[in-house]
Amino acid sequence: MDARILNSFDRVAFAVAEKFDAVELSPVSPLGTNFVLGGIDTNNVVATVRNAEVLGDSTPALALECARRRRTHAGDVRLCSSHRMIRLQPFDFPGFTPHFRLFTMDSAGRDTGSHAFEIQHLSEHIHFYLELFRALNAEGFHLRLPLVEIGDVSLSERLLAVAGVDRDKVREAVRAHRPGSGERLQAELGVALPSPVTDPRTELRDIPEPQFSRLCTMKDRVVDPLMAKFPEAQFRFTLARLEGLGYYTGLCLRISPESEDGGRFAVTDGGFTDWTARLLQDKKERLITSGIGTEFVCRRYRAESKPISK
């Protein structure tokens, strides 16, 4: 991959992420960071002999810095970074490789009630990616008609438990680097989670509280304003998503733009975790993480005939 193309992506992304502090991460993190926080299998992480490991996911590393800053900073913390990850697991999907560059973002703060933190920061993360797509399109990329999917991992887990499905089995079988693995597992188990909908208030009346009210709030306070600002984007709520169980703890997002040849891939993923709450031993702490596959986007969504501006 031409490094100048990757650098051009980063230049645009950092410019769009003006609300976030840009952090240059170390290539290694404390031993166990990827597993303890991110749940990444230790067999897929490169460890060193000096109690460190190579970054397999940069969002836990950003979470460590968020927690450090939150100890002395009363306000919200917003961090972003561009970093190359290394994983040891094999990839059999075209375009996926054991080492890859991600642009990631973490936002940390305190729960102030009425889903205020979730509303603000879920909206900010989605807004960033949709604005990024627009900016990249002006630079020779082709990220059209983005599909934004909002899910709730806690609700999906609850529905699976009612159906008698063990969460650990789901985590073993479903992986983000195996597109379609969630759908295949549901078919194998004979489980039918609710189909994606555009308005939970009218189409998901049977789901339990408090998740039902939370999804309705996200529709009113997050989706509707974003739809008005980004008419090219499609929004829907999905409870059939199984990727992220055990990683995220509540609301999650996934964005899939359309490429020039009509293909659609989930290039952006994110959601709320309990990492800073655990690190700071404070259940009121909140954290949302997200990332976009820089290298995959540059390979799959860039129109080669158009030059990158300097």
List where the protein language model places each region:
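Positively charged, Gly/Ser-enriched RNA/tRNA-binding surfaces
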Residues: 3-30, 35-37, 46-141, 154-165, ...
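Short internal beta-strands
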Residues: 146-151, 206
